[in-house]
């Protein structure tokens, strides 16, 4: 009887015990705090000649507080949502246009991206101008006047943990003609490549580093092998943020070597630099210096250069007024390949080869002050700045008919710039801009550029239609020329040819038919002004372009 009583008693209280046990298992209270973190972008710089509207890459991450529960057979894993999980890939972009006078343009980009593995892309760019021109006698010339730029390349990156292994290959080709005289063909190009491994220096809470190697080969396509040149380079950087302090170190090597006619050209550059920065609520600054050992084999100039570095800006909550100060320096190589890409009408002669082999590189020290800001949440933005530049071994281009050569001297300039942008409503924006060279040290050397330019633009930017009109004015230009006279020291004497100031009017309209197709039209230099590339090389007719864009 006693045993039966115990059994009945257990059966009676069992439901209450089980209920308490269930409540004990499910009564789990954990805090869950979703946060939206700063966007993390790939350190991929798009190389596009077309003005493609790039959309920002946004990465959202929801991170709960750390906890672990036994309600499930597996531990709870924090949710992670990335932009790439929902973004539709755009593997193909193509653009083609033709215009009158006869002009052609084309761009092609193929790409693929995997958020866990990496990316790959290939591209091709083309620009050609086949219009008739005018020679030195003022006669119209229709043959041997074409100009063309072509570029092909590829880039790929592999994610290795939090870092990226990246390879970049590209080749350029330029075609010109000396149409002011006999129409001689000018053809040259360059193949280049780069491989790098490291971080993108956006998250400095941990040590970031980057190591890379680069190389290129320049080929003179007319006198094959006479003015060829190669470059090799390597660099390494490390950086870390400690609290609000940033530390960065970098070292590098850059060498250039000529062949045949340029066999005496050898340039070896070694560099080392350091940066220290501080970021606070009101002030951001980065200060440092770079040392360069720049040895040009045929030059007698000192190879030692030290460049200061300073970036400082003051912040406020409204962002309506943000002043800044910048100081830096730069070493610009004056090798034959660099000169040809700057001015393709340089005449390659034995004298030029000898001069280039002994030509020191240009050094410049620059200081900039200014202020900018935006008001009304981006309704109005502006920027005003002044730049003082002190350069040594600066190259001044001078012409002799259809050919160009260079003379070096020191150059001191003061430039003032202003820009303002107004967005009264979401789809409209208006822009005005102006720049002036307020001072330059020389009266007998001329920089072949306007002393001032001003411009204004109006744009309408909606999802279906984009349209714009711009009007620019550039002042008269003094083009440096070689005089028949010589100085008392037997040095060449220079003069100038002055060309008038020019107004240029441009109009563009684009209609997006659907998500894949768009058509556009552009009017360039509708005023028919003489727009000079260099003295005696110009275009003076209005241009019209019709094109189509396709995105897959």
For every predicted segment, state its role:
Residues 95-107, 116, 144-148, 222-228, ...:
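Solvent-exposed loop/turn segments connecting transmembrane beta-strands
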Residues 88-100, 106, 124-128, 171-173, ...:
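Transmembrane beta-strand segments that form the barrel wall of outer-membrane beta-barrel proteins
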Residues 4-13:
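Sec-dependent N-terminal signal peptides
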Residues 89, 115-119, 158-164, 204-206, ...:
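Strand-connecting loop/turn motifs
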Residues 129-153, 157, 165-208, 212-231, ...:
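Flexible loop and strand-edge segments within Gram-negative outer membrane beta-barrel domains
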Residues 74-78, 85-94, 98-136, 144-152, ...:
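Outer-membrane beta-barrel translocator/receptor signature
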